[in-house]
């Protein structure tokens, strides 16, 4: 909104020189981060009190899991993702270029998945059960929205004449010449990336602060990636494909970081509120959509390797148990396995943060290793 105001004033004779700052992505990304942080922190205390009053017993805690969680975390309200999403959307409306197709595609995914997560959280809280919507219901809804968003990108996102067909191509990291055009099969691949990463973040959100910090690391990494591939000079220097308009997603990444910091203010151990599916599904979907827009889907698997590992641990556990009746891990997702081994919750969380930070640096390194 402010960016559009700047462009309107720039065409007149009344604009102030200070408004020229608005044309810089770096400035708007920083302001988006600050705005989202302020919104999340400002609404935090009142929102938490309201959620406690509305939810009563708070988020249901698994009774077959870590015993101390039942006593330590009982009564903690959920749906804290609303704080992050409020900051994200306010910041996006203020600082992003609202004519940009990529911005609206990411907001479509984020808002839709946030609504789906809210429905899941609401079902859990009202029924006081850890089972909300069925997995099939969530997956079908996620894939439908992701397919629609991907088709919009393919048809309407700006294209570079230097890289025809890139909108349906899969770009491999490190190997700069390895690009495979999947045609319309790319729609299924992109939808899987978005929905899969959304659920991976959701599975990781099981301990205080565990998911949100790796989300911020991933958002920082993809904010830089989006900025680079959206700038022809940087993309050419680094031998990256040029993706017109994708740089604007750096603003949304800044907003995710700011909203995440504001949420972490209240989610730091002992958590006063949980993110819930409202936040985890939305943020995972947002990162998946940003990776698709930037054509760095495979790099997301590296940067978000912690989330991928959490999801794989669940799939391995379920598949192996169905086949043999035995478990590979003491408990899945894998962060609970380490708790069962005797690691304190804070140790698990901080070590997982370290792993996610290392993976983020490795993901960034692929930009230069070509």
From Swiss-Prot:
Citing just one GO molecular function, the answer is: UDP-N-acetylmuramoyl-L-alanyl-D-glutamyl-meso-2,6-diaminopimelyl-D-alanyl-D-alanine:undecaprenyl-phosphate transferase activity
Q: What class of enzyme is it?
A: transferase
Q: Which GO terms describe its cellular component?
A: plasma membrane
The protein's annotated pathway: Cell wall biogenesis; peptidoglycan biosynthesis
Q: How does it sit in the membrane?
A: Multi-pass membrane protein
What keyword terms does UniProt attach to this protein?
Cell cycle, Cell division, Cell inner membrane, Cell membrane, Cell shape, Cell wall biogenesis/degradation, Magnesium, Membrane, Metal-binding, Peptidoglycan synthesis, Transferase, Transmembrane, Transmembrane helix
Q: Which family does it belong to?
A: Belongs to the glycosyltransferase 4 family. MraY subfamily.
Q: What does this protein do?
A: Catalyzes the initial step of the lipid cycle reactions in the biosynthesis of the cell wall peptidoglycan: transfers peptidoglycan precursor phospho-MurNAc-pentapeptide from UDP-MurNAc-pentapeptide onto the lipid carrier undecaprenyl phosphate, yielding undecaprenyl-pyrophosphoryl-MurNAc-pentapeptide, known as lipid I.
* Localization per Swiss-Prot or TrEMBL: Cell inner membrane
**Enzyme Commission number(s) from the entry:** 2.7.8.13
Identify the coding gene. mraY
Q: Where are its TM segments located?
A: 24-44, 78-98, 103-123, 138-158, 177-197, 209-229, 245-265, 273-293, 298-318, 347-367
Q: Enumerate the cofactors the protein uses.
A: Mg(2+)
Pfam families the UniProt entry points to: Glycos_transf_4
Q: What is its main location?
A: membrane
Gene Ontology biological-process annotations: cell division; cell wall organization; peptidoglycan biosynthetic process; regulation of cell shape
What does it catalyze?
UDP-N-acetyl-alpha-D-muramoyl-L-alanyl-gamma-D-glutamyl-meso-2,6-diaminopimeloyl-D-alanyl-D-alanine + di-trans,octa-cis-undecaprenyl phosphate = di-trans,octa-cis-undecaprenyl diphospho-N-acetyl-alpha-D-muramoyl-L-alanyl-D-glutamyl-meso-2,6-diaminopimeloyl-D-alanyl-D-alanine + UMP
**Can the keyword Metal-binding be found in this entry's annotation?**
yes
- What is the recorded name of this protein? Phospho-N-acetylmuramoyl-pentapeptide-transferase
Query: Which CDD domains would you find in this protein's record?
Result: GT_MraY
């Amino acid at each position: 909104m402010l960016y559009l105001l700047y462009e309107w004033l720039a065409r007149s004779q009344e604009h102030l020189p200070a408004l020229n700052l608005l044309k810089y992505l770096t400035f708007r990304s920083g302001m988006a981060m600050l705005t989202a942080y302020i919104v999340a922190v400002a609404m935090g205390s009142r929102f938490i009190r309201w959620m406690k009053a509305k939810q009563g017993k708070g988020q249901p805690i698994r009774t077959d899991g870590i015993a101390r969680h039942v006593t330590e975390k009982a009564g903690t309200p959920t749906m804290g993702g609303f704080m992050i999403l409020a900051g994200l959307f306010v910041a996006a409306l203020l600082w992003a270029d609202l004519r940009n197709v990529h911005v609206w595609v990411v907001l479509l995914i984020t808002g839709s998945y946030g609504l789906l997560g809210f429905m899941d959280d609401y079902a859990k809280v009202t029924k006081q059960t850890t089972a909300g919507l069925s997995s099939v219901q969530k997956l079908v809804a996620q894939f439908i929205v992701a397919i629609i968003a991907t088709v919009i990108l393919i048809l309407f996102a700006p294209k570079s004449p230097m890289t025809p067909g890139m909108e349906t191509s899969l770009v491999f990291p490190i190997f700069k010449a390895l690009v495979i055009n999947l045609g319309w099969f790319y729609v299924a691949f992109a939808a899987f990336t978005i929905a899969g990463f959304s659920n991976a973040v959701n599975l990781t959100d099981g301990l205080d602060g565990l998911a949100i910090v790796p989300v911020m690391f991933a958002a920082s990494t993809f904010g830089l990636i989006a900025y680079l591939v959206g700038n022809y000079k940087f993309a050419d220097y680094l031998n990256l494909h040029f993706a017109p308009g994708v740089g604007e997603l750096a603003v949304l990444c800044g907003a995710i970081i700011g909203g995440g910091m504001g949420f972490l203010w209240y989610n730091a151990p002992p958590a006063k509120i949980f993110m819930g599916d409202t936040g985890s599904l939305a943020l995972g979907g947002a990162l998946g959509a940003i990776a698709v827009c930037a054509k760095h889907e495979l790099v997301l698997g590296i940067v978000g390797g912690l989330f991928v590992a959490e999801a794989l641990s669940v799939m391995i556990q379920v598949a192996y148990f169905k086949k043999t009746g035995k478990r590979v891990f003491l408990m899945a997702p894998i962060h609970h396995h380490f708790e069962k081994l005797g690691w304190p919750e804070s140790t698990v969380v901080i070590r997982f943060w370290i792993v996610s930070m290392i993976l983020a640096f490795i993901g960034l390194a692929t930009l230069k290793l070509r």
